[in-house]
Amino acid sequence: MSTDKTDVKMGVLRIYLDGAYGIGKTTAAEEFLHHFAITPNRILLIGEPLSYWRNLAGEDAICGIYGTQTRRLNGDVSPEDAQRLTAHFQSLFCSPHAIMHAKISALMDTSTSDLVQVNKEPYKIMLSDRHPIASTICFPLSRYLVGDMSPAALPGLLFTLPAEPPGTNLVVCTVSLPSHLSRVSKRARPGETVNLPFVMVLRNVYIMLINTIIFLKTNNWHAGWNTLSFCNDVFKQKLQKSECIKLREVPGIEDTLFAVLKLPELCGEFGNILPLWAWGMETLSNCSRSMSPFVLSLEQTPQHAAQELKTLLPQMTPANMSSGAWNILKELVNAVQDNTS
């Protein structure tokens, strides 16, 4: 860190808005940004890398992943080939998030001592539309649970999460199912389709994610692994048909992502996870454990959601960043967004 007197340590809140697609996250984030617009240089909004997804070295990940399901249903591609194509397109979503996350992490002051307090204004806010955990865990796991991907594709996505710096505040956004279906139908992104089983599973998986983070604060995944049954077709169908996963104040391992990660393909003869995948599970656990989870309803207006998000700020975990690093981050974000406009 620079010793220049103008390069001072600041309190920063790193906030990631996440959740199922089409529920109004981006609109809520923009409204939150508008709320703080009266304070120049106070908040930095990092949008979804949509244009990169639309043209990642010449491939459109969004049209590709949804189009593959249409081709499979029409009989234009075999189920096995469709699973391979889906895994390919899902991997394309990961790269922009992972690269940006690595740049952000490198700019953070990761020391846990002498945290600058953020309970007194002004402090900086970095608001990101999604965390890499969306493209590496929540969406691929949901694709697997509806049969769009094979289990062989999961470890390369689930267990390769980047290290998580201190001060990650993950805000999972929710709406009622009727509102969700209405909103995602109206936004009509090119190539995007509405598949009810996938939407339902994704909603369940995000609740499992919150339960997982809470569970790992006081437990480890080893403790209850042997009590879990294998994730079978009956459980998968249940996840596709109802909102069967409930948010728990004190979740058990059966309420977490580990309930769907206990797959025969990842385990040995007696249900023990194979060593390589066990190490990967530790990576996933360490990343999740480092987060502070929150839930934000988007059921009402974007203005109401922005106000509700503001009320959560005092509960969030701060991080440190130098003023110089903050300026570098702004330049990086502006450069990326300028090239995707």
Swiss-Prot record:
Keyword Kinase applies: yes
Keyword Methyltransferase found: no
Residues binding ATP, per UniProt: 19-26, 183
Keyword annotations of the record: ATP-binding, DNA synthesis, Early protein, Kinase, Nucleotide-binding, Transferase
Classification via HAMAP family: HSV_KITH
Subunit structure: Homodimer.
Protein name per Swiss-Prot or TrEMBL: Thymidine kinase
Provenance organism: Varicella-zoster virus (strain Dumas) (HHV-3)
Gene: TK
